[in-house]
Curated annotation (Swiss-Prot):
The gene is mhpA. This is 3-(3-hydroxy-phenyl)propionate/3-hydroxycinnamic acid hydroxylase. Pfam families: FAD_binding_3. One of its GO terms (molecular function) is 3-(3-hydroxyphenyl)propionate hydroxylase activity. It comes from Escherichia coli O81 (strain ED1a). The keyword NAD applies. GO terms for biological process: 3-(3-hydroxy)phenylpropionate catabolic process; 3-phenylpropionate catabolic process.
């Protein structure tokens, strides 16, 4: 697959607000989000083009919502297969775990297959929308140094020329072997799996069966995955004593493929590559003016398809905070909440991925026998079966501290969780997803009420300066009731009834939603003012809070 990139003019002794090391998916997403916020960004990439072979193959609903936030989801969807099930098979082919979630609470299918190089190309092309963003290929990051108010980055071109970039912030998205992380001596704690796997990608899918299958064969476990555009991926465990060179030999490749294909000679190989599965987590995500994201901060086995998606969560969490700090709307202490919020969830996804790998290829033979026996019980325990079928075991991001205000018991609070994204009806009759009505902004969303009623004039001014949208949700049949309109408030109809159900479940009538779509706080009209003051404080917003009481009585 040939990936094109635009002609790039060199930047010599250039000054930008943010330098991003690495033009992988996390770096490209960071650049797109910051670009639409008007931030001057320079992306530098060691390679001469985007990687053009498939790597990650799973993109989830949260990542698609992130793509939506930068206006690229419509271009990404043609390179995905939605509702992609994952099935674990015994050595005899019996399905003992069928992971097939059909929920779309965040607006998109939960599990999707995709072709990463084509989606990366969409993100790279997306940068062309922003004159304030540039991407330089064939630039090796040789050194960097931090000062009180900037980072100096030293680059080397393919021709050996040196360039210097001065940036307010450096975001390291330079992969698991991150030069930036290693230079800063940040511990990368974890382990490397003893077994390797060989990945074989084939064009014109010779099986064409949908979904992904993980066969728990004790002799040689393997994976068979259907990907978009008629690509088939097989993954086989590399056994002790085998080498990549040996497995790539035609007779050995034929032997591998004969396990899964009736005619292993009639295939169109795209590539074969051996991977080692690592499970590692950086001790720190922020070091003064340097921030680590994606694989530079955490790497995990592929079995739950969460390495790519965890990187997208990093980008979404960090980008809006970095934009606020650069724009002078928040102090840089806000950036400390990035590690506070993201590190624990990244660890949870690492642990889940390791567990899934142990189910596929248990370290001990007896563990595989136990797994196969226990799997029969799933058929007789419907609640447990639904737990796997609906992917409820996936640790959903939930932040217990950071840029949020929590009231009451944390276990049942929606604060720190991603807000739902149902369809809503606009006053002109159009039906759209909620985020499309809000844009890349904060939102104060009220069920049935005027969200401005509980705010002081000073607070309204402060939150409008952040670009906040004020949303009044009403039953769809009330959307054209003119007397309910309020200046500066967008009214939307609850097309599917999901917003009413959400507010009823959580005993709140107002939600403060962050730009990354997480619930920062909940309130009722009489307590909204006090809640916003607390939130402004924990987010270190630069405008002083109004020293007035804004609680109201009816």
């Amino acid at each position: 697959m040939a990936i094109q990139h635009p002609d790039i003019q060199p930047a010599v002794n250039h000054s930008v607000q943010v330098a991003i090391a690495g033009a992988g998916p996390v770096g490209l997403m960071m650049a797109n989000y910051l670009g639409q916020m008007g931030i001057d960004v320079l992306v530098v990439e060691k390679l001469d083009k985007l990687i053009d072979y498939p790597r990650a193959i799973g993109i989830d609903d949260e990542a698609l919502r992130t793509m939506q936030s930068v206006g690229l989801v419509d271009n990404v969807l043609p390179h995905t297969t939605p509702w992609h099930a994952m099935r674990f098979l015994t050595p005899k082919g019996r399905c003992f775990a069928d992971i097939q979630p059909m929920t779309d609470e965040f607006g998109w299918p939960r599990r999707n297959a995709f072709i990463q190089p084509q989606v990366d190309a969409v993100m790279l092309e997306g940068l062309s929308r922003f004159p304030n963003v540039r991407c330089l290929f064939s630039r090796e990051l040789e050194a960097f140094s931090q000062q009180d108010d900037e980072v100096t980055v030293h680059l080397k071109t393919a021709e050996g020329q040196r360039e210097i970039v001065k940036a307010q912030w450096l975001v390291a998205c330079d992969g698991g072997a991150s030069f930036v992380r290693r230079t800063l001596n940040v511990p990368f704690e974890g382990k490397t799996a003893p077994n390797q796997w060989i990945v074989v990608d084939i064009a014109n899918d010779p099986l064409s069966t949908p979904h992904i299958y993980l066969c728990c064969d004790p002799v040689r476990p393997y994976v068979s995955a259907a990907l978009p555009h008629a690509v088939r991926r097989f993954e086989f465990m590399v056994m002790p004593g085998e080498t990549e060179e040996q497995l790539r030999e035609p007779q050995n490749m034929r032997k591998l493929l004969s396990k899964v294909l009736p005619n292993p000679d009639n295939v169109e190989l795209i590539r074969q590559r051996v991977y080692t599965h690592n499970a590692r987590l950086a001790q720190r995500f922020r070091i003064d003016r340097v921030l680590l994201a994606g694989d530079a901060a955490h790497i995990m086995p592929v079995w739950q398809g969460q390495g790519y998606n965890s990187g997208m969560r990093d980008a979404f969490n960090l980008a809006w905070k970095l934009a606020l700090v650069i724009q002078g709307k928040a102090r840089d202490a806000l950036l400390d909440t990035y590690q506070q919020e993201r590190r624990d969830h990244a660890k949870a996804m690492i642990d889940l991925s390791v567990t899934a790998g142990n189910v596929l290829a248990p370290p001990k033979r007896w563990q595989g026998t136990l797994r196969d026996g226990v799997s029969w019980l799933l058929n007789y325990l419907p609640p447990v079966k639904r737990y796997f079928l609906e992917m409820r075991f996936k640790p959903m991001p939930q932040y217990y501290g950071g840029a949020l205000v929590r009231e009451g018991e944390a276990k049942h609070s929606p604060v720190g969780k991603m807000f739902i994204q149902p369809k809503v009806t606009l006053e002109n009759g159009d039906v759209t997803l909620l985020d499309n009505a809000i844009g890349a902004n904060f939102a104060v969303i009220g069920w049935g009420c005027n969200p401005l009623w509980g705010m002081s004039d000073e607070q309204i001014q402060q939150w409008r300066a952040l670009g906040t949208r004020f949303i009044q949700v009403v039953p769809e049949v009330q959307i054209h009731t003119a007397q309910d309109n309020h200046d500066g408030v967008l009214r939307v109809g609850d097309t599917q009834g999901r917003l009413r159900s959400w507010f009823a479940q959580h005993n709140a009538s107002l939600v403060v939603m962050r730009p990354d779509r997480f619930v920062a706080a909940t309130a009722i009209p009489q307590t909204l003012g006090k809640t916003l003051n607390k939130l402004a404080s924990v987010m270190t917003l630069t405008r002083p809070d109004a020293d007035v009481s804004v609680e109201k009585v009816a």
